[in-house]
Amino acid sequence: MVLKYFLETFKSRKATLNPIMSNSTPTARIKIGYDLAEVCRAAAGEIQRMADRSATPAKPLTFALSGGSTPRSLHAILAGDPAVRDRLPWHRLHFFWGDERHVPSDDPQSNYRMAYETLLSLAPVPTQNIHRVPAEEPDAALAAEKYEQELQAFFKLEAGQPPRFDCILLGMGPDGHTASLFPGTEALHETKRLVVANWVEKFKTYRITLTVPVLNHADLIVFLVSGAEKAEALKEVLQGDYRPDRFPAQLIRPDNGKLLWIVDKAAARYLTHSIII
């Protein structure tokens, strides 16, 4: 699949249109902000617009949250800025996770704990709208199976059918991983499961992660990438040869949705204005 990218910059910076391969190719956008704060402000705006566009007031809006440090600033805006917080229909927002560490929910490394402390406990989110990974299970494979069952029940899925999230938030590491899809790991090649326990050798642990088919079935995928340490990987993911075993973020190519990269200047330092993958 060929993706065509529209490169945008924020505020007074001039937008640049990138080459278009054909009218039928799926379109992704890249927004480049000055710093992490600007990146997260833009992401909050995307979430707000998505909620505003929702045509069915009673329909749940489903999000998959990401881990890492980058989302903290986004959470602070969503939960702490009245201009954003007071406009979001929190009673309709359902929160899931793109991946989780195999630790109890109160562990400092828990993605759930980070999201709860920085967002979910500070916003009027009904308890029943929080769908965390049962990562306290001693057996990581069982935790993945239980979370898959949670998705199947909530989204009322038929066998083999992936859920359609309204929005999946993703990050990217300096090694090009996203969610817990790490270079060279088995989960990169999973096509039938919704959730798997993925052994990550460099950490000597399992990570529980949504699979590529689930991520690519979302209505909107938003990558948030910040920091100079990710610049080389970002260039490879967006402009390098297609090597998803080495740079797993290249696997994220929505089958019938939108893809948006919001990155800061430090992360975008090696990108050119001609981005076609």
How should these model regions be labeled?
Residues 52-83:
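Glycine-rich N-terminal segment of FAD-binding domains in flavoprotein oxidoreductases
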Residues 3-7:
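Short hydrophobic targeting helices and cationic amphipathic motifs
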Residues 167-213:
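Class I SAM-dependent methyltransferase SAM-binding "motif I" and its flanking Rossmann-like core
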Residues 22-27, 87-166:
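Ligand-binding beta-strand-loop-alpha-helix segment within the catalytic cores
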Residues 65-70, 170-174, 226:
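Glycine-rich beta-strand-to-loop/alpha-helix junction loops that act as flexible
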Residues 213, 219-277:
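ATP/nucleoside-binding phosphotransfer catalytic cores, i.e., glycine-rich phosphate-binding loops
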Residues 76-88, 113, 117, 183-192, ...:
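A glycine- and small-aliphatic-rich helix-loop capping segment at beta-alpha/alpha-beta transitions
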Residues 20-63, 141:
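N-terminal glycine-/serine-/threonine-rich phosphate-binding loop
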